[in-house]
């Protein structure tokens, strides 16, 4: 699950200052991997790696950078369609004021933050927490995350009835990830022959499995192998993972 979230809530060392910052994000994803999606999204939004990777650390309410706001909705939570350019602008304004200092610590500067509320997805928001709440409460959020997670675990998108049923499970739980994962893998279709054979292993999964089979404990060799296969951890090719 940590690998899934690393590819979904993407940051990359090619733009982030230090490996330490990337490792801290890894630990954050590990902490929240089967926890609450809302809490994880709140934490990632003000995480040093994400602030640097998608330019939140360069954003002020007077001159908001829209990169993170746009990807937050399009790639991380809602998908294309449920929001407008005005929503992107509003989210960027409300998210402004978070920075990373020279010691890689994150801090909030109220002088750079929004002076008052803005309208996002039909709600009044003025802080990062408000932005995440508005997004997570949107009816497109649960089905979007369900589809992405179902695809990762099974190799296929759910049909509409299955998606809506899983989205209801996810929403009723308050966006808890573990019950959603359990609902996906406990369904009889998960182990049916066509379904179970449709998902190819990612290079990282294949290499880890191979090392386990042969009893090899060599991180350097593992890194060389996944790099040769085109899937280096902490270096995704773009924000889509």
Which functions belong to the PLM regions below?
Residues 41, 89, 164, 178-181:
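Generic structural signal for individual residues within well-ordered alpha-helical segments
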Residues 84, 102-103, 177-179, 192-193:
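Acidic/polar loop patches that form or flank catalytic/metal-binding clefts of enzymes
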Residues 29-33, 169-178:
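Short, mixed-charge aromatic SLiMs
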Residues 1-22, 26-159:
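Non-catalytic, conformational "gating/processing" segments within enzyme and secreted inhibitor domains
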């Amino acid at each position: 699950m940590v690998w899934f979230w690393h590819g979904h809530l993407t940051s990359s060392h090619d733009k982030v200052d230090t490996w330490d910052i990337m490792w801290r994000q890894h630990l954050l994803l590990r902490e929240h991997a089967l926890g609450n999606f809302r809490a994880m999204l709140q934490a990632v939004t003000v995480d040093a790696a994400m602030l640097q990777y998608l330019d939140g650390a360069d954003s002020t309410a007077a001159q908001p950078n829209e990169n993170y706001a746009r990807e937050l909705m399009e790639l991380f939570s809602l998908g294309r369609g449920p929001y407008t350019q005005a929503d992107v602008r509003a989210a960027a304004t409300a998210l402004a004021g978070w920075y990373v200092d020279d010691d890689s610590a994150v801090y909030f500067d109220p002088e750079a933050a929004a002076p008052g509320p803005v309208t996002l997805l039909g709600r009044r928001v003025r802080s990062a927490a408000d932005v995440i709440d508005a997004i997570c409460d949107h009816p497109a959020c649960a089905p979007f995350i369900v589809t992405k997670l179902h695809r990762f675990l099974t190799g296929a998108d759910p049909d509409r009835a299955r998606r809506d049923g899983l989205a209801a499970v996810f929403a009723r739980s308050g966006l808890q990830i573990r019950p959603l994962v359990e609902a996906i893998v406990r369904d009889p279709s998960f182990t049916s022959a066509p379904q179970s054979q449709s998902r190819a292993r990612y290079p990282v999964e294949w290499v880890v499995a191979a090392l386990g089979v042969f009893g090899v404990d060599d991180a350097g060799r593992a890194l060389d192998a996944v790099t040769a296969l085109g899937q280096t951890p902490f270096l995704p090719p773009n924000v889509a993972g």
